[in-house]
Amino acid sequence: MNTFFKLGSLIQRTASQISSSFPKSRFFSDGESAVYHHARLFKKPLSTKLKFNLVNSVSLMGFVDRSIQVMNTGPDRFGVFTILRVKDPLNPNRSFRISLRMWDAMARTCIAHLKLNDHILVSGRLESYSKSSSDVYSGLNLDYQVKVAEVNYVAAPPSHVLDSQISKNPKTKTEDDIEESKKDEIYLWQVFFSNPYDWWDNRRNKKNPKQPDFKHKDTGEALWLCSDLPDWITRRLELFDQKNRFYDEEKTRRDRLSDYI
């Protein structure tokens, strides 16, 4: 009896000494060793088969920043577009905008149901397109859009995401409408300057003042010149016209030289 008691005490002391000889830092609270933990964190990513339906697939959550607009398309296709404003969940003051394009059945669903400031989750394929491709003096300039395949409403968005949409000093509807209209106009000018050759320039052949000075070739959106335009728009237009004049002069000079060759 005493022999077994002494042997048990010896085993307990030995086990205690062995366990105490290992630094506690080599193990985590869940019993996982530091070596295994490091290997698990930095292991090589798994391989997967190429799935073409998932190439450039994206899902974005944000707010409808513009009313749904119908695109000028052929009789066999129906397309609409809008702008999605995506906010950083950790910093509501940071956001970006991206164009959404919807076609056929999806386009009809969106134009029937989506409204300005709707909080939505869209899934689709990210596409790129070249801007100012007709401008020989600019380098490759890409922009991005999402060809939408699925749209879902987002229920009960977090309050910190909506804080910029809720004004502390309530405004009248008229003031809101004016502010929204100005914001849309400024954004349209930014779209224009990003790719001015996607717009018809009607400044020299307007039949009446109500006609727009610039009209988008696909979406039909319009811009008018007015006396209260911001200075930066006026300066950008002057540079745009100057560059076009220089291009026309260079083209004329090359054509004349070719006549003598």
Swiss-Prot record:
Transit peptide (first-last residue): 1-28
Tissues in which the protein is found: Expressed in root elongation zone and in gametophytic cells.
InterPro entries recorded: NA-bd_OB-fold, Primosome_PriB/ssb, ssDNA-bd
GO cellular component, one term: apoplast
Phenotype of gene-disrupted mutants: Severe leaf variegation, distortion and partial sterility.
SSB domain residues: 55-155
GO molecular function: single-stranded DNA binding
Region (PDF region): 189-238
KW Transit peptide (keyword) present: yes
Compartments it resides in: Mitochondrion
One GO-annotated biological process of the protein: negative regulation of DNA recombination
Key words of the record: DNA-binding, Mitochondrion, Transit peptide
Function: Regulates mitochondrial DNA recombination. Represses homologous recombination, preventing mitochondrial genome instability and unbalanced transmission of alternative mtDNA configurations. Binds preferentially single-stranded DNA. Does not bind to RNA.
Free-text comment on this protein's domains from its UniProt entry: The PDF region is required for protein-DNA interaction while the SSB domain is not required for ssDNA binding.
Protein name from the UniProt record: Protein OSB1, mitochondrial
